[in-house]
């Protein structure tokens, strides 16, 4: 299903529902959710906190790019057996390599944005993590696209899987989609000319980074847009 269709909720809610019924090992990791980026891991963790607010389910987010204090906090959550572990592949492998993480009781293994993980080169990491998991488990892959490499991964780590596809959503009829092929230095000029032709009342502009957002904002102020 496409990005933004609720795939994360579609995996968190059923898992929490199952855990709330009981029958799963206490003080053990029961679910591992893999995320391609730290930002997505943080987002899933926030949603997890919201969905599980009134449930006796614990979670820990494990992702890179932090100091030693954060690493120790992750270690504590992993060794105490948080019900749900939300992790980026590289960071989880770092903990696994130190020998204190037990994934032998995991019942649910979820790959969120599996296509992005493969695009970022995490295929070998995923296969390495799978080796720590029990054979008797439910494995679920969520992906916006289904290229050949995703289908191959599914055949490798899934057992007789069911494939569910949601129809591709289309923009409203009144929306006009246009693509401009240009150099980086030409982008602001193109936007300026578009605004001069027809000044819009409301605009949403997406940028690739926080720094780029600041640069674009400053440029627009200079242009008095």
What are these regions (language model features)?
Residues 1-225:
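Conserved helicase RecA-like core
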